[in-house]
Each structure stands twice: as C-alpha cells, then as structure tokens.
Amino acid sequence: MISGVPDHVDGRMLAITEQAGGSIINRDRMWHYVEGIRNWAPLWTDHAIRILPGPSSLWLDARGKRLPVPLYPGFDTLGTLSHIMSTGFDYSWFILTKKIIQKEFALSGSEQNPDLTGKSWRQVLGRATSGVPGPVKAFMEKGEDFIVEPDLPALVARMNALVGGEPLLELAQVKHEIRARDRQLDNPFSKDMQITALRGARAYLGDRLIRTAKPHKMLDPANGPLIAVRLNILTRKTLGGLQTDLDSCVLGTDGQPVEGLYAVGEAAGFGGGGMHGYAALEGTFLGGCIFSGRSAGRAASRAVG
C-alpha cells in the first residue's frame, strides 16, 4: 500500500490512551481507497494521491477482467477494495481516453486543486472548457502510474512493462472488454449498467458541465489517445476509535469513564465508532464530529465548574 497521510499521522495517541486505561473499539475497521497513485513530487514517504473519478473510466483487474456490477468509478469503495483483494493482486487499472480525463479526473489534496485553494471562481468554471487540468496533466507526463499511447497494443504492452515480471494482461482480453463496452453505446436502451449510470449522471447539469464526459467509444481514434492508470491501494484512516459515553468522556475497559479524558471526532471513531453505519464516510461523519465536540466541551465545562 501507499500512504494517504503524512508520516506524522500515525495514530500513536490511540495507543497511548489505551495504555492509560482507555478502551478502543472497532480497531479492525479500516478505510483504504482503491484509486491511489504515487505522487511524482512526494511530500512524505510513499506519498499517495487519490483520484476522484467520474463515472466513465473502464475498470479492469490486474488480469484485464472488468470489475463486476456495481463496482464502477466512484460507486463503492469498500466493495471494490474487497473484490480487488480477492483477485490475488493489490492493484487494478483504469482505461480511459483524453476526453474522459480532461473532464472526469480530479485529485485529492489542496496542492492538486489550486483553483479551489485560490478561491478563484474563474478557474473553477474553467474546468468545463480548459482541457486537461494542470495538476492532472503533470501526472500524465511525470506520474509513474500513467501510460498514454495512441493505440491499444502499445498501451497494453506498456501496462505489462510497468508491472514487470510475467505479463498478466492479454491484448485480446483487454480489447474484448473495451469492445463490449463500446458496443453498448450504439443502443439507446443500453444493457451496460455503467453506460446507463453515466447517461443518468449527465442528466444533472453540474455533472454534464464539469464532471461527466459525453459518452463515446474508447477505441475510436478520434477520441484518443488512450490512457491507462495503475491504481494502488492507499491508506487513509481507521474507522475505530476510543469508546466514549454520551458526554464524549473516554470509557475504560471496565466501562467506567476515565476522569478528565475526552475524545471526539475521528479519535472517537467519528462520533462513537460506527454510528453512521459501516460504509459511511467523509461528509457523512461531519455531524457526528461536530456534535461529539460540542458534547465534550459542555461536559468539560461542567466538570470544572
């Protein structure tokens, strides 16, 4: 795996709190992303950047087989992670075109989104018209996980070369998967659920403008060049945390509050450890983080009089 957090984010305070008597629950629950790429200009060890993908890229496993329904880009992180690991490999592939990458690829991290961090509406709106975003283009040119070629045979050859060892990808298999997908674009009542999903996404104006490319055939040279991206597993966070009561006071292994010790937000498993369900993440947890912080503040205020 590659690292989605800096070296100093090591969770050591959870262990220190446990040594002080605090109880940790759900320590087996982790959240790892499956769209990780190595940063060509790393800021920490094994620095990973996550691709925030639109719905159009074709997702293949290490042997070139398409991931099953509904494991499409941006759909189900935990389900996709489980499937990828069941293949016996720890990486997968996106196959896409220049038309897709210029509209559908966003990258995590403030340094990868200068338009947002710079608070420039002009630059944000430019995502709809300005071609491949600068940070994405830099990865296309310098990122070790990106391959750009004008035709499929050359693309597959370089994909195998990137991984090294015995070639795992067969040109015929990859071509079969792409052709099967492309054929469904001829049918307005597509039997391909991913095609149906991206057509549905484009029904929303915002996605049509800056997030979802117009459906097109990947093997049509007019839509090229072809692009392959090796996707690595990247670490992010534990979904477990310190067990607390309703005042956000840390509980000991005996179930009693540890006096003067509080835990909120991520340290408490996002407000209690699983209170939003197993597959919920990110913005879904904001309410629990804020609420647990408020509870801790009020309880601490009462404790000190």
Describe each PLM feature range.
Residues M1-W40, E282, L286-S295, A299:
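Glycine-rich loop(s) and the adjacent beta-strand/alpha-helix scaffold that form part
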Residues L14, S23-L169, Q173:
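An anion/pyrophosphate-binding glycine-rich loop and adjacent beta-alpha core
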Residues L52-G54, R236-T238, E282:
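Short, small/polar residue-rich loop motifs at catalytic or cofactor-binding pockets
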Residues A62-R63, L246, T253, F291:
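Short, ordered coil/turn segments that flank beta-strands lining enzyme active or ligand-binding pockets
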Residues S82-E104, A268-A280, T284-S292:
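Short, solvent-exposed cationic patches
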Residues E166-G271, M275, A279:
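A glycine-rich dinucleotide-binding beta-alpha-beta segment and adjacent secondary-structure elements
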